[in-house]
Structures are given as structure tokens and as C-alpha cells.
């Protein structure tokens, strides 16, 4: 295995032991934790529409599950959809997480953070109305499909999902099962991630590791293609929602491993309108994909520094892919941001900065700028509305590095 994986593991281990020592005093009292480490509700979306959300579990009868104990079952895909809704409200009245106790258990285990520090997660609220009625009189609206990162969740970028939906977009996001932090299907059936480096057998060679990651990438990409197929037959699944969905106007968006997932999908799904990658992990993409033409309008937003990846090939692969793209590619590198600034994780509490999980950038200002960039870009590429100029981007972000190809 490459040295940068050993280095990353060492850094994570240091953080695992450092955090509990600093906060040991607070773990004994939930009341103190809630006061010292409050977690904020999601911000109210700025668009004109109230937002509804629905959750489905779809079965792909064309594919068997890819992990051993499930290899005799068809792959199941949990999907959440955000959309403009009829009526409703922008009040914070819905829970952010379906299963907060499971979420606390996963985060506590993965980062060795005392669960008592995460108690406030179950109190986080969002303005999206669960099982709201789609605003069908809007007619067909553009679709965005989102792919989460390694160990992430379908709702890890809910702030962006709600913002886009409030501006008239329909957003589908799935849990990549066995890659998502956890998936609860029903009752006591919980499927945890088996995709981290620690899940690989001891003695796994570098070649074996990347062969597995390429297979992993393909399965994730097939998940996205399956969602596209399901959208085509949505009138038999949810007739009201189908009236809003323009299946001929689909864009993709992904964070981290989700970034390479949507980029890989572009090579199989030729009708995609545009694509946004948030701090993409491109290392799993094989050379034969990197050297192809994605032929799609593409925007990448990410960190200015390469320290997180500890491997210059992540940037080099992105550069190569961009150079081979025959359509417009724009890369935005934002100073003082880190990997998890491009998800909801950075918004909930200042403590993420204290432990170096997120960057020094002002989280509220960055959220507003990021949301504005996403809305402006999709308006430009999916609706032919407005403009997406480098000058406007610089006004929003200030000191950034912008590369346009």
C-alpha cells in the first residue's frame, strides 16, 4: 500500500486520541456538551419555493450485491429526493437525520469521538417537509443526481440539496450500499461500510488495492445509471413527482469519491447536461477513463492545497481529464478550505475547525458563496439562464485560483 495511506492513517489516529483528551471534561455531562458544543440547524434555503423530500428504496434486479454475504441478493439502493413542493413552509420542523442514534454510533466508531459529544445531532432540524406534495404546476424541471463520498451518506450535502430545490431543481441522491457510513433498510437490518482501508485484508498489494477500487468505482457508477433508468419510469413509481422531472435534462454532482463516480458515469451516460465535482478524489479512476473525453460541461471546486490527498497524482489525474474534455471545464481552488468544508459537516459547529477537520474559511460566508455558485452554474448549463463568468466567481470568493479550459 502506498505510503500516503500510512501517513493518513497516522494522522487520523493522532486525531482520534487528541480529541477525547481535549474534551474529556465535557463527556461526562450531556447538558454541558449541549451548551459548549451546540450543533446548528440547517440554514433556510434562499429560493422562492418551499422544499419537500421523499425517500425510496429501489431494487436493481439486473445486478447482484457485490459483497460476499449479500452476493445472492439483488442490489438495493436507498434514494432521497428533494423538490419544490405545493404549500409547505420554510420553518425548521423536520429532523435532519432519520436514524440519529445509528449516525452517532458510526461517527463515534470511525473517529473515536465519544458519542456524548454528538448528542445534539438528533436535534438538528431542516425546513424540507417529509413526503410533501410536488409542485406539479411548475411543469418539467431539471434533475441533478448526487453521489456521496467514501463513508458518506445520501444526505451529507442537504444544505446544497435544499438550496437547489428551492430554486426549482429536482435532486436525487443515493446511498452507495457498503460504501455509505451505514444504511438502515428496515427494522434491525443495518448495513455498515466495508470500503475503508481498514476493511482490506492484511497484505493487500498496491495493485490489488487499486483493482478493487476500480471495481468499487464501477459499482457506484452503475448505481447512478440505475437511478437514471428509474427516473425514466418514475410515472409508475410516483406519478406526481414524475410530472416535475425532466428526464431529458439531467446533471450530476458528487463529493470526494462521489466526484470520480459522476465523472466516470459521464463516459457511460452520454446525455448528461453538466457535472459538478466537489473536491473530487480522482485516484480511483483508471487511466483508460482519465484519457477519454467526457464531452460535458464541467465545474470542479476544491481545496487550494494538495496536502489532504498527500499524492500529487490526484491533481494530475484531474488536470488530464480536464485537458481531454472537449466541452468547457472550470476549476476553482478555494484557499482556507478543507475536504469536509464541501459538505454539511463544516456547518454544524465551530469545533470542526478546532480539530483541523475543516478549514479556516468563514463557514457561513463559504456556504452562501458555494450555494450561489452551484445555482448559477446549473442555471447557466441546465436552463440557459444568466451567465457563469470568471469575474462573477472571483467577486463571490475573493482570493481564489481559477483555471478555465
Please place each PLM-identified region on the residue numbering.
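Domain-level recognition of soluble alpha/beta enzyme cores
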Residues: 33-143, 363, 374
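Alpha/beta-hydrolase-fold serine-hydrolase catalytic core, especially in secreted/extracellular enzymes
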Residues: 34-45, 52, 61, 68-69, ...
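Active-site machinery of serine-nucleophile hydrolases
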Residues: 85-88, 95-112, 155-204, 335
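Short substrate-entry loop that stabilizes the transition state in hydrolases
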Residues: 127-141, 146-184, 306-311
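Alpha/beta-hydrolase active-site loop
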Residues: 184-244
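Primarily recognizes the serine-hydrolase "nucleophile elbow" in alpha/beta-hydrolase
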Residues: 227-292
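The feature captures the conserved acid-bearing segment of alpha/beta-hydrolase catalytic domains
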Residues: 273-339
Amino acid at each position: 500500500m502506498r505510503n500516503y495511506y500510512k501517513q493518513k492513517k497516522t494522522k487520523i489516529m493522532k486525531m482520534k486520541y487528541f480529541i477525547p483528551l481535549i474534551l474529556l471534561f465535557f463527556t461526562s455531562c450531556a447538558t454541558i456538551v449541549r451548551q459548549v458544543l451546540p450543533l446548528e440547524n440547517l440554514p433556510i434555503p434562499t429560493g422562492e419555493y418551499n422544499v419537500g423530500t421523499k425517500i425510496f428504496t429501489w431494487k436493481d434486479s439486473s445486478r447482484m450485491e457485490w459483497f460476499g454475504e449479500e452476493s445472492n441478493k439483488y442490489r438495493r439502493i436507498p434514494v432521497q429526493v428533494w423538490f419544490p413542493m405545493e404549500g409547505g413552509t420554510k420553518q425548521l420542523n423536520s429532523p435532519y437525520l432519520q436514524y440519529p442514534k445509528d449516525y452517532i454510533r458510526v461517527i463515534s466508531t470511525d473517529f473515536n469521538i465519544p458519542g456524548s459529544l454528538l448528542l445534539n445531532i438528533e436535534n438538528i432540524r431542516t425546513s424540507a417537509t417529509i413526503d410533501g406534495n410536488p409542485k406539479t404546476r411548475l411543469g418539467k424541471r431539471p434533475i441533478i443526481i448526487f453521489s456521496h463520498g467514501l463513508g458518506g451518506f445520501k444526505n451529507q450535502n442537504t444544505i446544497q440539496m435544499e438550496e437547489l430545490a428551492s430554486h426549482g431543481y429536482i435532486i436525487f441522491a443515493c446511498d452507495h450500499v457498503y460504501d455509505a457510513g451505514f444504511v438502515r433498510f428496515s427494522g434491525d437490518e443495518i448495513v455498515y461500510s466495508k470500503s475503508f482501508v481498514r476493511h482490506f485484508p492484511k497484505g493487500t498489494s498496491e495493485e490489488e488495492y487499486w483493482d478493487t477500487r476500480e471495481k468499487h468505482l464501477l459499482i457506484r457508477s452503475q448505481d447512478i445509471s440505475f437511478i437514471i433508468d428509474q427516473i425514466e419510469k418514475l410515472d409508475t413509481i410516483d406519478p406526481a413527482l414524475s410530472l416535475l422531472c425532466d428526464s431529458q435534462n439531467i446533471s450530476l454532482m458528487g463529493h470526494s469519491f462521489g466526484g470520480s463516480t459522476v465523472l466516470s458515469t459521464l463516459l457511460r451516460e452520454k446525455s448528461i447536461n453538466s457535472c459538478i465535482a466537489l473536491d473530487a478524489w480522482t485516484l480511483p479512476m483508471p487511466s483508460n477513463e482519465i484519457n477519454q473525453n467526457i464531452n460535458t460541461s464541467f465545474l470542479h471546486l476544491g481545496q487550494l492545497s494538495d496536502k489532504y490527498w498527500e499524492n500529487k497524482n490526484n491533481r494530475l489525474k484531474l488536470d488530464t481529464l480536464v485537458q481531454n474534455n472537449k466541452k468547457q471545464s472550470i476549476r476553482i481552488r478555494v484557499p482556507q478550505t478543507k475536504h469536509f468544508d464541501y459538505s454539511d459537516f463544516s456547518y454544524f459547529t465551530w469545533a470542526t475547525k478546532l480539530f483541523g477537520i475543516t478549514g479556516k474559511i468563514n463557514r457561513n460566508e463559504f456556504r452562501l458563496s458555494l450555494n450561489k455558485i452551484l445555482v448559477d452554474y446549473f442555471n447557466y448549463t441546465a436552463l440557459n439562464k444568466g451567465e457563469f463568468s470568471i469575474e462573477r466567481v472571483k467577486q463571490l470568493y475573493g482570493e481564489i485560483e481559477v483555471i478555465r479550459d
